[in-house]
Amino acid sequence: MHKLVPAAIALALVLPVGALADTSSDIASLRQEMDSMRAAYEARLQALEQRLQRAEAAITPPAPSVAAAAAPRAVVASGPAVTAATPTAPASAAPVVAPVLAEAAPATPQVASAGGGANAFNPSVSLILSGLYTRTSQDPARYAITGWQLPAGLQVGPSTRGFSLAETELALAASVDPWLRGAANISLAPDDKVSVEEAYVQTTSLGEGFSLKAGRFFSNVGYLNAQHSHTWDFVDNPLAYQALLGTQYGDDGLQLTWLPPLDQYVELGAEVGRGRSFPGSDSGRNGAGMTALTAHAGGDIGASQSWRAGLSMLNAKADDQLLLATNAAGGAVTDLFNGRTRVWIADAIWKWAPNGNATRTSFKLQGEYLRSTRTGNLVYDIGNTDRPGAYRAAPSGWYVQGVYQFMPSWRVGLRTEGLDAGTPDYGPNAASFAGGGFKPRKNTLMIDFNPSEFSRVRLQLAQDRAREGITDNQLFLQYQMSLGAHGAHSY
Amino acid sequence: MTNRHCLFTLLAAPLLLFALPAHAALRVFACEPEWGALAQELGGSLVEVSVATSALQDPHQIQAKPSLIVRARNADLVACTGAELEIGWLPVLLQQSGNAKVQAGQPGNFAAADYVRKLDVPGQPDRSQGDVHAAGNPHIQTDPRNIALVAVALGARLRQLDPAHAAQYEKAQADFAQRWQQAMARWTAQAVSLKGVPVVSQHKAFVYLYDWLGMKEVAVLEPKPGVEPTASHLQEVLSSLKATPARMVLYSAYQDSRPSEWLGKNAGIAVVKIPFTVGGSEGAKDLFGLFDDTLARLLVASAKP
């Protein structure tokens, strides 16, 4: 009671003050609102006045040419649709015509040429066209990586010889609403198969550096994994990606990335997914078949250099994964793997361009190291021997590549890479496999010519020693073209 | 106890009024130096400006590098040219920034080209025409009248984002507008002799400058926008100059000077390096210096026999 009384008095004293503060802050905010409204109108008025002056100045030249005098009238009458008329006007008249022409455009000059109507909200569409000529000294149908057990459907090595269509990629992207954007990449394979490479929605509004993606996407592990094939610097992905991540790891799930509030670039990411592809296997379980953690940091060194480096980890579960292998006798067998795989990836890239202007010359050096541990059990020779046993392997792979743009439109690149199957522990199946110890190696040289930002022709030569005792000399001639929306590429 | 909590809350509440305006300066991330300089003119000490590119870089071709992503992440306002100039890199920056405030359509996303009348708007955009921009020529900063228009819009945007300092922004804007009008009057008077002067451009980057000064572009060294000049096209331009002579050839500070120098030597005309944006030359230290220096260079070149 004693305490309540002074409290009540204090409350009674404070409340009106609070109320006063409220009204005065209300007034202040109202005033601010009015001020900003007034400012906005003033801005528009000033802009309109200036336009009017310019229009008047342009319409009344001392002695206008016939074309210049006629064109504005025609344009004003029929609106922006006639903009095509400008290029045909004589060069001398163009500067006079142009200002007047644009005056006819609406006051809010937002993308008037977007096409209006129902199509105005169409997503941006781009289509990548790509084709190959391949020449190899060994038959690609018999391509294998000695000492490695990989799933049957996995594409490793060159796909075919001679002329072939490469992947055709259709990309669609647009804002969903003020809070989300969506994108899809549909891949049309040369064998007429259609696959959904990526199809996701992504938040734009979480703020605080957070971004959430849901759907199918390429995992953010490593450097090359998230990049679409048309942005690769070589025709093919490194062997390490082919043998450890099934060329490129994509999954259905969720991806959360966060940029902490720092002046230094740090990006942290976490992913959960179905585990639908190698090194996982699609098993339809309720839980996550894949989890991944990524961390990247980057920055500039002066005006001419920039870098990014990172460490990622990907876990995937495999149930009844069929693997093609070669046994000690040199025969082809199919094994069955059950277990889990953990892939660690360290990646780094360094780019240089004089004063940060990559138009004329630039250089980039990148490298990644991938190490995978597969633990579980392996049933040897399905359908014949059917012998189960514990299995543990720690294969690894790496590549280093440099790409130098020595003059506008021309680049040359060199890549060297290697694989190490490690010393797998086959348990009771040990006697069925050869000792191994062979380390595949590959060196690749490429030169590409980019007539514009949207087209590229590339020649690639490679010496591939993925098979023990066999050297495959490969030649590729490739074109990659982009139609439609101007793509924006990540670093 | 609960009463006392209420009391403390009531007493503490007004403190929030002091706490809120005390936050750090408005962080402006400008895509090009001209908008960084303009934001600095209009915001003074109220803004903290960071510029993504320098005058020595081609604004069409910038990489969405980590240092830019982190600056976009921390920005309150992203001020860019728009009109697809930054289409190859800004969308990636914004996507990866995780910053809701600066996404397209938000008050924190400002595109200067939305507030000016654009030239070279293609009727039927097609890439056979080179790297054309469907929204029109994006190099709007070469006309000081455009700077004036953008200043009005950017000032309004700063007041909208930071209403607590609206009066200060308004004052800075009025001050800038006055100085700019005076400068424009001076430049216009200085540039009278440039009216009608025929010129060659290396890239179609100066249409707004020509529109302002009444200069006439008779040829372009790039066969198509964004395509590097070829030897055969340079020869064509050289021979076309016999029929329609030009007085000078212009290129931007970030460009390779060799095509312009080749033409200058072979056609016997002046070669002019245009600073193009703030920082593009010794003299172009700020927006005023940019136009002072641009005009000085053009006048020197046009005075040559």
Residue map of PLM features:
Chain A
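A broad helix-preferring feature
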Residues: D26, E33, E49, E56, ...
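Outer-membrane beta-barrel pore domains
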Residues: Y200, Q305-Y491
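A short secondary-structure junction signal
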Residues: L268-G269, P279-G284, Q321-L324, V379
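Gram-negative bacterial Sec-dependent N-terminal signal peptides
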Residues: H2-L20
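Outer membrane beta-barrel
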Residues: A89, Q110-F278, R285-A303, M313, ...
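N-terminal periplasmic/intermembrane-space "pro-region" immediately following the signal or transit peptide
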Residues: A21-I145, L150-G153, Y265, L483, ...
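Short, surface-exposed, charged loop/turn segments at secondary-structure junctions
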Residues: G284-L293, T326-A328, G383-N384
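Short helix-to-loop capping/linker segments positioned immediately adjacent to catalytic or ligand/cofactor-binding
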Residues: P279-S283, A297, T334-D335, P354-G356
